[in-house]
């Protein structure tokens, strides 16, 4: 069984994240979506909320694939968390050259620390390239329409959280 580890903050999950997750299911038997918990950061959604939104978005988009996805939290090094879950693939989505430069540096460091874990880059689809969770939060907080950038479940949760 090929287990892939897909880390991120997913605050909130965007269509870009979902695009990468769908691609990941084509290269791995199981995908661990790992929500990073960072002390000092104040996320919009709690871990439990993010986990539920990821699961709902996946079930709305690919019903029947939920059994192949597990959502976990982690607060340690990505490679250590991947090992704890038996993953040998580390998945990273790429939107542009800036992402590539950063992710290549991270992949090199991860390779030094964990030569048994291979980083796999998955390119974002054309429609999801400009999307970031930070921009989604900012646009939504200012009353903008983000329905083209997030799954339906996330849109509903954003509207409820921001009382719109």
Swiss-Prot record:
It is found in: Cytoplasm. The record marks 17 as: Transition state stabilizer. Its EC number is 2.7.7.3. Pathway: Cofactor biosynthesis; coenzyme A biosynthesis; CoA from (R)-pantothenate: step 4/5. The keyword tRNA processing does not apply. SUPFAM superfamilies: Nucleotidylyl transferase. Reversibly transfers an adenylyl group from ATP to 4'-phosphopantetheine, yielding dephospho-CoA (dPCoA) and pyrophosphate. This is Phosphopantetheine adenylyltransferase. It comes from Agrobacterium fabrum (strain C58 / ATCC 33970) (Agrobacterium tumefaciens (strain C58)).
């Amino acid at each position: 069984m090929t287990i892939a580890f897909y880390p991120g903050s997913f605050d909130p999950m965007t269509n870009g994240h979902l695009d990468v997750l769908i691609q990941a299911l084509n290269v791995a038997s199981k995908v661990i979506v790992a929500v990073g918990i960072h002390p000092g950061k104040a996320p919009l959604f709690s871990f439990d909320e993010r986990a539920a939104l990821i699961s709902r978005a996946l079930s709305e988009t690919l019903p029947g694939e939920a059994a192949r996805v597990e959502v976990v939290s982690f607060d340690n090094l990505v490679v250590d968390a991947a090992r704890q879950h038996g993953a040998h693939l580390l998945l990273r989505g790429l939107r542009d050259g800036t992402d590539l430069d950063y992710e290549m540096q991270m992949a090199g460091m991860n390779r030094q620390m964990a030569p048994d874990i291979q980083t796999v880059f998955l390119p974002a689809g054309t429609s999801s390239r400009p999307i970031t969770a930070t921009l989604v939060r900012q646009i939504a907080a200012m009353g903008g329409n983000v329905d083209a950038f997030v799954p339906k479940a996330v849109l509903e949760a954003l509207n409820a959280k921001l009382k719109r």
